[in-house]
UniProtKB/Swiss-Prot annotation:
Keywords: Cytoplasm, Elongation factor, GTP-binding, Nucleotide-binding, Protein biosynthesis. Residues 9-283 form the tr-type G domain. InterPro entries: EF-G-like_DII, EFG_II, EFG_III, EFG_III/V, EFG_IV, EFG_V, EFG_V-like, G_TR_CS. This is Elongation factor G. Gene3D superfamilies: 3.30.230.10, 3.30.70.240, Elongation Factor G (Translational Gtpase), domain 3 (3.30.70.870), P-loop containing nucleotide triphosphate hydrolases (3.40.50.300), Translation factors (2.40.30.10). GO terms for molecular function: GTP binding; GTPase activity; translation elongation factor activity. Disulfide bonds: none annotated. Belongs to the TRAFAC class translation factor GTPase superfamily. Classic translation factor GTPase family. EF-G/EF-2 subfamily. GO terms for cellular component: cytoplasm. Transmembrane segments: none annotated.
């Protein structure tokens, strides 16, 4: 089956995404079980799930790296990317969304839409990914299908259209009404393989009728022929409904909603059927866009195995046995093992050692990967996350991925002197795998600092150092990753001259520096050759290096752009080094005039508390410089949404527990950087000295 050729129309590249603990890995496990890939179902709480293949994942029962797995269902090849639901791993979700064609969002029937669901949904909106929703855990206490559908509409503004209704809930959840076919499925056994297709139970006919009418109205909105039939009261066939639904999903106008219990094996095969019926194939999505490396001209590439190669390396992982694996999506063309490809971001040729298709943690060697496929490459040396691989005769750079800045850092040191070098190598490998993880040396103290997206993120990094790389280390207290920026548009000069004996040094430049919302930009506006072309990159490098340490308290400077507009040079004494120093001097001079301010990470916090503790909790959030955004009731509790500076959130879990007698819980995730009040800024500067 695996070696059979599948036409592109029969491919589905989908991601499974959700809030932590919504049952995502369990659902993926069941999909692998029903599609014949696994003979015994792995249970997450037994620590045996096949998709969770890193040791820490099996211990913690959460998914950290997104494994890409190939399986087969009803004559289709389905590539599944399982993504983590914990906020510290948003980057994994971001990278997988970049390479999928469709996504299944899993909700917990008890909670409906949760904060991480919102984050992931927004990320999917950015990439215009068609999606559907599976409301899981229908067998659990407090499961409420209609409430969950309501949260999709209210919190995500999604046009959520139920295609199914559950028969019973909690302990009595026994089957599913299929609104498309207008019949019912009753489960007869625990494995969910024995089921009866019967009529809709009497006591649910009225409700099924009401929801089927809503379904028909939704498909009529996207299909004029159905609209005419519907208005004239004609019968609309099941096939017509399915065709219109597919059209609506692909246009991001309809989000189909299904239900079930992955753990109890109910609803999973129907979910697989729906993935094939309504999710896009690589042919249904727009041709991938990119630019020509030398001219910057926009280009597109079709999903066609005969077109020139265009592929994106979306994840780098280190495998203990075969070394570096580059997970790759082939958008067009064909990649063959043993051949050379061109990495257009690095401008280097790379040799492909082996090509493998992944199944959670076992590999199948293949000779080639074609347009629309996902696989991993062994043997690449210089490729990192987000790089494009293509033909050197036909180069293209696909849109790169942007990753958020780390918000928290800790100092780390090996327990033994011998561990220092080992730790350096290990940290470099981990940083290569994960673009939101950074490691650097603090120039003043000489300490090694690791920075990431949250405490769990860094805990797992330290854990991997010990397990995979056998480096024992001591870890300091978490610190907030402050940044600096400017508020004024200024001009400044950088002049570096040294002419005492021997060869002199001469570099001189004028820059304009201005605040911006986006990433760092460098614009060369020098005319008339006042600075020779070959020295321009050195000025840019000098500015970028100097921006790693701002003038307020030595934190990295962000959100600014630079325009180089003038300067001068000396025929003999000028060098790249001299211009690099001049660039860094110009940067420091500009920053001292540009109203520099300190920025701190502001976190989006969502606290769920029983009503009687609300006053206390809100008072506490206000005392932490929090800004309350709103409150909504949810299942006997109140949900408080607020923005709070990260520096005020350390130890919050303990405070919340004592204020609510253990009944409150919270989640937080990085939202944006904002200016630090003067009094706090002075305190931070004082602590740095």
């Amino acid at each position: 089956m695996a070696n059979k050729e599948y036409p592109l129309a029969k491919f589905r590249n989908i991601g499974i995404m959700a809030h932590i603990d919504a049952g995502k890995t369990t659902a993926t496990e069941r999909i692998l079980f029903y599609t014949g890939k696994t003979h015994k179902i792995g249970e997450t709480h037994e620590g045996a799930a096949t998709m969770d293949w890193m040791e820490q994942e099996q211990e913690r029962g959460i998914t950290i790296t997104s494994a890409a797995t190939t399986c087969f269902w009803k004559d289709h090849q389905v590539n599944i990317i399982d993504t983590p639901g914990h906020v510290d791993f948003t980057v994994e979700v971001e990278r997988s969304l970049r390479v999928l064609d469709g996504a299944v969002t899993i909700l917990d029937a008890k909670s409906g839409v949760e904060p991480q669901t919102e984050t992931v949904w927004r990320q999917a909106d950015n990439y215009k990914v068609p999606r559907m929703v599976f409301i899981n855990k229908m067998d659990k206490l407090g499961a409420d299908f209609l409430m969950s559908v309501g949260t999709l509409r209210e919190r995500l503004h999604a046009n959520a259209v139920p295609l199914q209704l559950p028969i019973g809930a909690e302990d009595s959840f026994s089957g599913i009404i299929d609104l498309v076919k207008n019949d019912a499925i009753i489960y007869k056994d625990d494995l969910g393989t024995v089921m009866d297709e019967t009529e809709i139970p009497e006591d649910m006919k009225e409700m099924a009728e009401e929801y089927r009418t809503m379904l028909l109205e939704a498909v009529a909105e996207v299909d004029e022929d159905i609209m005419m039939k519907y208005l004239e009261g004609e019968e609309i066939s099941v096939e017509e409904i399915k065709t219109a639904l597919r059209k609506g999903v692909l246009a991001n106008k309809i989000v189909p909603v299904l239900c079930g219990s992955a753990y109890k094996n109910k609803g999973v095969q129907l979910l697989l059927d729906a993935i094939i019926e309504f999710m896009p194939s690589p042919l249904d999505i727009e041709d991938v866009k990119g630019t020509e490396p030398t001219t910057g001209e926009e280009m597109t590439r079709p999903a066609d195995a005969k077109a020139p190669l265009a592929a994106l390396a979306f994840k780098i992982a280190t495998d203990p046995f075969i070394g570096k694996l580059a997970f790759t999506r082939i958008y067009s063309g064909t990649m063959k093992s043993g051949t050379y490809v061109f990495n257009s971001n690095k401008g280097k040729r790379e040799r492909i050692g082996r090509l493998v298709k992944m199944h959670a943690n076992h590999r199948e060697d293949v000779e080639e990967l074609k347009a629309g496929e996902l696989g991993a490459i062994v043997g690449l040396k210089d490729t990192t996350t987000g790089d494009t691989l293509c033909d050197d005769a036909d180069p293209i750079i696909l849109e790169n991925m942007e990753f958020p800045e780390p918000v928290i850092d800790v100092s780390i040191e090996p327990k033994t002197k011998a561990g220092q070098e080992k730790m350096g190598i290990a940290l470099a490998k981990l940083a290569e795998e994960d673009p939101t993880f950074r490691t650097y040396t603090n120039q003043e103290t000489g300490q090694t600092i690791i920075a990431g997206m949250g405490e769990l993120h860094l805990e797992i990094i330290v854990d991997r150092l010990i397990r995979e790389f056998k480096v024992e280390c001591n870890v300091g207290q978490p610190q907030v990753a402050y940044k600096e920026t400017i508020k004024k548009h200024v001009k400044a000069e950088g002049k570096f001259i040294r002419q005492s004996g021997g060869r002199g040094q001469y570099g001189h430049c004028w820059i304009e520096m201005m605040p911006t919302e986006g990433e760092y930009e460098f614009q060369n506006a020098v005319v008339g050759g006042s600075i020779p072309k070959e020295y321009i990159p050195a000025i840019d490098n000098g500015i970028q290096e100097a921006s790693q340490s701002g003038i307020i308290a030595g934190y990295p400077v962000i959100n600014f752009k630079v325009k180089l507009f003038d300067g001068s040079y000396h025929d003999v004494d000028s060098s790249e080094m001299a211009f690099k120093i001049a660039g860094s001097m110009a940067f420091k001079n500009a920053m001292s005039k540009a109203d520099a301010v300190l920025l701190e990470p502001s976190m989006k916090v969502e606290v769920v508390v029983p009503e009687e503790y609300m006053g206390d909790v809100i008072g506490d959030i206000n005392s932490r410089r929090g800004r309350i955004e709103g409150m909504t009731p949810r299942a006997g509790a109140e949900v408080i949404r607020a923005f709070v500076p990260l520096s005020e959130m350390f130890g919050y879990a303990t405070t919340l527990r004592s204020k609510t007698q253990g009944r409150g819980n919270y989640v937080m995730q990085f939202d944006h950087y904002e200016e630090v009040p003067k009094s706090i800024q002075d305190k931070v500067i004082g602590e740095r000295k």
